[in-house]
Amino acid sequence: VSSLAHIRGRPIIDRGQVFAISHGGMMVSIDLRSGRRIWGKEIGGLSNPWIAGDYIFLLTNDSEVAAISKKSGSIHWVQSLPKFEDPKTKDYPIIWNGPILASDRLIVSSSLGQVLSLSPYDGKILSSLEMSSGISVPPVIAGKTVYFLADNASLVAYR
């Protein structure tokens, strides 16, 4: 882990493996007991990854949601998200938060207030909705409810 710079998301421990991602462009899997690096992948991100089954789901620095194999670090799929509010001029970058997994859907939210649900199996966008305000923090799941804290201090819950 010492070779990783700019770690913003918390490392995740799952079944004897530690997974860490840096904003600087590296994700690694490390054996928890020995400290030996199992694999490394040139991919960067700011948010905490989400682990489910054999995959790690994450947001990349390039506004992509990706599914990566826990075992090998190979990329299973990648889904691009909008990067700019105005794609022609590349003004006003969009900041994405998440992902979280809820009821067979990956959920991400944006600084513009857009919420997307994606298939964890192939990354296809399944649905989209617009909040009344931007969202600057990742959504939270508790029980069967997903909570979003919007920038206008609204707390929105979906089941």
Feature-to-residue mapping (PLM):
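Short loop/turn segments that connect beta-strands within beta-propeller blades
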Residues: 31-34, 69-72, 119-123, 159
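Hydrophilic extracytoplasmic domains
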Residues: 110, 120-159
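WD40 beta-propeller blade core
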Residues: 28, 66, 116-117, 156
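Extracytoplasmic beta-rich repeat domains
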Residues: 1-13, 36-53, 78-100, 126-143
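Solenoidal tandem-repeat scaffolds enriched in leucines and small polar residues
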Residues: 1-26, 31
